[in-house]
From Swiss-Prot:
The lineage of its organism: Eukaryota, Viridiplantae, Streptophyta, Embryophyta, Tracheophyta. The modification Phosphoserine is found at S224. InterPro entries: Kinase-like_dom_sf, Prot_kinase_dom, Protein_kinase_ATP_BS, Ser/Thr_kinase_AS. Interacts with MEKK1 and MPK4. May form a ternary complex composed of MEKK1 and MKK1/MKK2 and MPK4. Interacts with P.syringae type III effector HopF2. Interacts with MPK11. The active site is at D190 (proton acceptor). PANTHER family: DUAL SPECIFICITY MITOGEN-ACTIVATED PROTEIN KINASE KINASE 5-RELATED (PTHR48013), MITOGEN-ACTIVATED PROTEIN KINASE KINASE 2-LIKE (PTHR48013:SF32). The gene is MKK1. Activated through serine and threonine phosphorylation in response to wounding, cold, drought, salt stresses, abscisic acid (ABA), hydrogen peroxide, bacterial flagellin and laminarin beta-glucan. It comes from Arabidopsis thaliana (Mouse-ear cress). Induction: By wounding. This is Mitogen-activated protein kinase kinase 1. It is an enzyme of class 2 (transferase). Expressed in roots, stem, flowers and siliques.
């Protein structure tokens, strides 16, 4: 890989984005393949059956946007925001993700991918999705509210996470990865601290499947370039085919960041920061992988990180294999209370705070 270049081959410009109109019906339904979303909810339809698909009918006891009271905005992104909302009757809190559709086909594809995965996934280690709607150019997704925020929020409060707590966090994330990798054949492709959410019950859940990839089989490979550059595996950055082992690399970086309190890749000593994202990703591809300092951490943790961040993905362990690692099991008999830790760390979001 050439210094300062993101890919070893000449960059190919993507085709011009197509109009958003290809995703909309005259009745105001957002569609992509078998997926249909409108003001009444979401459904998947059979494309093999002749004729128009049946209308979307609201389910009994279905959540609706009219039932929700907006409390405050708890997250912002380039295409929308996440609001804390409360059900007017039950007083239960939810997170409402509101996305403004634009004219880019890639945005529409990402939204439909997230909706499709949310609709079909049932796992206690993934953030639950309760309902989705499309109306007046907005996609609204009602999600489980994780009142502790994200691991990124936790790190801002505590600086570093001790090994016993990190082991418990790791076990929960690995169980989520086992589900998406082996049961659903999904590569997350954007695993990072801000996409791992926590709550006062000590739960840790994976969220944000907007750039995920659904494979045809567990042995299939992907080749598209999406996600957050710093947490990308070397094979993804270099444009090679990749598998769900790319998520394992990202997990290793996340855990090492939580343990040390800083991102594993640091700029050269004479620099205060990376001059560009290209310099950083070049270092990820060209330099030796990061490691946990053996004088600061247990042999079990150092071994676990090493098995996650092997440069060759064939040398990385799978999520199932890592669940059997000594680091994941070494604190099982100890009094590791994630619920108390998350609460004592002061990371909980006060729902009604100004």
């Amino acid at each position: 890989m050439n210094r300062g270049s993101l890919c070893p081959n000449p960059i190919c410009l993507p085709p011009l984005e197509q109009s958003i109109s290809k995703f909309l019906t005259q009745s105001g339904t957002f569609k992509d393949g078998d997926l249909r979303v409108n003001k009444d909810g979401i459904q998947t339809v059979s494309l093999s059956e002749p004729g128009a698909p049946p209308p979307i009918e609201p389910l009994d006891n279905q959540l609706s946007l009219a039932d929700l009271e907006v409390i405050k905005v708890i997250g912002k992104g380039s295409s929308g925001n996440v609001q804390l909302v409360k059900h007017k009757l039950t007083q239960q809190f939810f997170a409402l993700k509101v996305i403004q559709l634009n004219t880019e086909e890639s945005t529409c594809r990402a939204i439909s991918q997230e909706l499709r995965i949310n609709l079909s996934s049932q796992c206690p280690y993934l953030v639950s999705c309760y309902q989705s709607f499309y109306h007046n150019g907005l996609v609204s997704i009602i999600l489980e509210f994780m009142d502790g925020g994200s691991l990124a929020d936790l790190l801002k409060k505590v600086g570093k996470v001790p090994e016993n707590m990190l082991s418990a966090i790791c076990k929960r994330v690995l169980r989520g990865l086992c589900y998406i990798h082996h049961e659903r054949r999904i590569i997350h492709r954007d695993l990072k601290p801000s996409n791992l959410l926590i709550n006062h019950r000590g739960e840790v859940k994976i969220t944000d499947f907007g750039v995920s990839k659904i494979l045809t089989s567990t042995s299939s490979l992907a080749n598209s370039f999406v996600g957050t550059y710093p947490y990308m595996s070397p094979e993804r950055i270099s444009g090679s085919l990749y598998s769900n082992k790319s998520d394992i690399w990202s997990l290793g970086l996340v855990l090492l960041e939580c343990a040390t309190g800083k991102f594993p890749y640091t700029p050269p000593e004479h620099k205060k920061g990376w001059s560009s994202v290209y310099e950083l990703v070049d270092a990820i591809v060209e330099n030796p992988p990061p490691c946990a300092p053996s004088n600061l951490f247990s042999p079990e943790f150092c071994s676990f990180i090493s098995q996650c961040v092997q440069k060759d993905p064939r040398d990385r362990k799978s999520a199932k294999e890592l669940l059997e690692h000594k680091f994941v099991k070494m604190f099982e008999d100890s009094d590791t209370n994630l619920s108390a830790y998350f609460t004592d760390a002061g990371s909980l979001i006060p729902p009604l705070a100004n």
